[in-house]
Amino acid sequence: MNRTLMKNLMDYSVGSLAFFAVGFALMMGTSAYMLVGTEGFFLAGGAYDVGTMLTWFFMLVFCATAATIVSGAIAERPKFSTYVIYSAVICAVIYPIYGHWLWGGGWLSSADFMTALGGGYGALDFAGSGVVHAVGGYVALAGCLMLGPRIGRYNSQGKPIPIPGHSISLAVLGAFILWFGWFGFNPGSTLSAHELRISVIAVNTNLCAAAAATTAMFITWRKFGKADVVMTVNGVIAGLVAITAPCAWVAPWAAVVIGIVAGFIVCYGYWFLERRGVDDVAGAIPVHGLNGTWGLLALGLFADGTYGNYATETPFITGLLYGNTGFFACQLISVVVNFAWAFGTGFLLFYVLKHTLGIRVSPEEELAGLDICEHGVVTYPDFVYTEPARPTRIIRLSESVIERENEPKTGGKRG
């Protein structure tokens, strides 16, 4: 558990520095050929501009969110050192460049051929289903594939073996905190406190989360004979992710439909990946990746023409169900580009790290626990484990790792 907390601390700390030095300029700087920003490194030139500071801080929190998505998916097996490098790269390069294409005046939103196709506007993403969540989800997929499953996650026949989470109570508490926080995430993306659409966005956000959670609950109840708490929690987050792109442009009834579909996606997406050997500890890929994609497509389907593009003041955003086939095509293009960019760059990053520094701890360290092996602490120091309470082999492995770490260093480098 300490390892997960430490990764999240570094996602925000290292991510803040990386986004300050490089990421913000690539994302929001003056565009070069609508591909990447070229000005504003280290916030040079705008250090005392209130608007620049506010934009940097607002976008930073979104950036850190994308980084933390990967943390949950690849838990319990990556080296801490290489994880810190990953965190810096996603915040400095991967998230900002795709973000520039949609939010920084880049080609997906503003190129002539995209605006002509969409009927006056290119691809859109109100608050980050694609820019934040799908990017994080598909980088997580790349990380899971490169790392492989945890020891004991599958038997010799390849059948998945459940590994229970640390605390369902904390998971539910976290879901409620996220649910509440999303009312800053989505309504806050209006960038204006007097924007009247805030009320619609808040209602849509809540309805979609509720519909997705209820759907996930009924699916697991039907499948297992009992309503599954963890999958219902993932349903809440899946609904929040799915509504993040279309929240300003769809009607409340559409938000409910989007949430119902999100509930199906998170359940069956997780089981599909699990059967194929993808060990996604937190369900981040179906929650954020697949439902981030669904959010982009849902915008292209359900946008009802009652609200414009807040950035360009385009009056009416309409989707496929309201006769705008071209805008749905723009969203499809955005989905394909999103997956290709996030998964491609994520796979390349983890591949390079794997074949240089290494990305996975040793089997002994993994079994002993990364709290002890890489951070030198245990989560609950007052707990006393006896032989009957823990497998003997794991106790021996833990002791051997601790002894090895306490041996005098004789020079050389650990692989």
Question: What kind of feature is each model-predicted range?
Answer:
Residues 1-415:
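Glycine- and aromatic-enriched membrane alpha-helices
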